[in-house]
Amino acid sequence: MKKQHDTIIVLDFGSQYNQLIARRIREFGVYSELHPHTITAEEIKAMNPKGIIFSGGPNSVYGEGALHCDEKIFDLGLPIFGICYGMQLMTQQFGGTVERANHREYGKAVLKVENESKLYANLPEEQVVWMSHGDLVTGLPEGFVVDATSESCPIAGMSNEAKNLYGVQFHPEVRHSEHGNDLIKNFVFGVCGCSEGWNMENFIEVELEKIRETVGDKKVLCALSGGVDSSVVAVLIHKAIGDQLTCIFVDHGLLRKGEAEGVMKTFSEGFHMNVIKVDAKERFMNKLKGVEDPEQKRKIIGNEFIYVFDDEASKLEGMDFLAQGTLYTDIVESGTATAQTIKSHHNVGGLPEDMQFKLIEPLNTLFKDEVRVLGSELGIPDEIVWRQPFPGPGLGIRVLGEITEEKLEIVRESDAILREEIIKAGLDREIWQYFTALPGMRSVGVMGDERTYDYTVGIRAVTSIDGMTADWARIPWDVLEKISVRIVNEVKHVNRIVYDVTSKPPATIEWE
């Protein structure tokens, strides 16, 4: 299929920031893909990109295990922008000198622009940038000039404009680099000559055509959880092929208040999709009876879900494709190319060997924030598009220890109150994740004139970018007070509320 947008390729040399580069470029309205540094020049040529960016990385270009690229990439005649390690690699390739710095430079630095190449067009002569390197370019390759310097880095930026080659020692993709976005924009638009054309409207049009071509008159099966990824996949595919899609929604009894009903109302009634709801509460609760260990609970819930899905799928005839909500981050973090990832996932989720499906993964070029934008474009309600991250085992790991119907009801009701009050306070887009948990401990209290001995409910709320690290959310005291008063008064068998003020690390976001 012919691409309808310009593309910038990012080569991954191991930087923790490499995904940020691709995301920044997409935010400009230009499509960008991240590829391993081992990609060949021929493969890049076939993609017809407008330019290439070499990411940073933790290695030394002269050290053992140094990562290199196909040297023929430099013969493609494409603009290349090397960031940190990428600049050092370019320097080495063209005969310059890279040496170990006297001390590793990490943190903010003041950059002074000495030569206004296209990269620095309309940018201030002095700007704050983010450094993170242990090596330095100490000798320029022939044909290159110094673009910028810093106190500890005499060659903080370089260029050979005749060949459209540029390098910087700092990280423009990181927020701490105050004009970093403008610098990347200058490369994308000023050097590479890209035009804006990457947007969700364009993506939907291209992806619908691709799904129709792939599926033809065959049938597709989708496991619908009500989460944003599976919801967007289901709606997108349904828009493409209509009733050729069948969704299976497993209600394991561990969902939040009103969730099962909400899923059916939204997708079965709202989008008129063919959704098979499986009520498996009793089946799951029987398996979980007496189980206290969190890992064992996770395993039981995960395995049982597969068995239930298998049972229902086997009742359906002629299902050729399985739809999955695989995101671009899943593919990138697996360290493999898209095709290899699909191959390794032919038994998705541990499905039995005799259940062979061809995969459809329409979101596998999108980041999470882009999936939310896509969901909104497709008309999916905000409460699903902006749904809180929810673990696969559901409330099963928010009830610490053995799961009972009574404990599930306490978590379900208290969590509903928390969500309602957070939304009322206008904090639902500011806090990355918030929920209640039942630690299983009881304490003495007084309600009316009587002594009580009831459960404690814990509130967990965190701010984060990606969930890898998190800080506890500073919810205003008056909001916390409302939440506490409501839970104690409206939820049976609760007489105490505690607020978790631990960051990640050392704690995890979930309690189990």
From Swiss-Prot:
SUPFAM superfamilies: Adenine nucleotide alpha hydrolases-like, Class I glutamine amidotransferase-like, GMP synthetase C-terminal dimerisation domain. Pathway: Purine metabolism; GMP biosynthesis; GMP from XMP (L-Gln route): step 1/1. One of its GO terms (cellular component) is cytosol. Its EC number is 6.3.5.2. Residues 198-387 form the GMPS ATP-PPase domain. Keywords: ATP-binding, Glutamine amidotransferase, GMP biosynthesis, Ligase, Nucleotide-binding, Purine biosynthesis. It catalyses: XMP + L-glutamine + ATP + H2O = GMP + L-glutamate + AMP + diphosphate + 2 H(+). Residues 7-197 form the Glutamine amidotransferase type-1 domain. It comes from the Bacteria. GO terms for molecular function: ATP binding; GMP synthase activity. ATP binds at residues 225-231. Homodimer. This is GMP synthase [glutamine-hydrolyzing]. It comes from Bacillus anthracis.
